[in-house]
């Protein structure tokens, strides 16, 4: 059963790509966890040991306690206590948020 998830934000390049910004494992109910597990198994593109690369289709709203710059993370940001707030079934993947928006949160804090 997959229960730990990695989330990305879009870069602002001409050809946007996802860059990892958070890992979370809490926030979904049991039914959502089972549904997401089935989706992951059906939509795996590559396997890296226990980790998987997936089709870019799902959007989740992520909450966190704090955000700050980080030289250790590829995205350039780190979030404190990330958690899943909700599964955004109403949004296509290309409407997920951008790294630029997250950087603005750091600048405006």
Describe each region flagged by the PLM.
Residues 1-109:
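Classical nucleotidyltransferase
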């Amino acid at each position: 059963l997959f229960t730990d998830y990695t989330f990305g934000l879009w870069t602002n390049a001409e050809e946007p790509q996802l860059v990892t910004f958070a890992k979370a494992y809490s926030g979904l109910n049991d039914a959502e966890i089972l549904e997401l597990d089935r989706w992951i198994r059906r939509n795996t593109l590559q396997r890296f040991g226990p980790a998987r690369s997936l089709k870019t289709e799902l959007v989740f709203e992520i909450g966190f306690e704090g955000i700050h710059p980080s030289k250790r993370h590829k995205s350039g940001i780190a979030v404190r206590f990330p958690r899943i707030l909700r599964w955004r079934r109403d949004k296509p993947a290309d409407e997920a948020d951008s790294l630029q928006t997250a950087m603005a949160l750091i600048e405006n804090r």
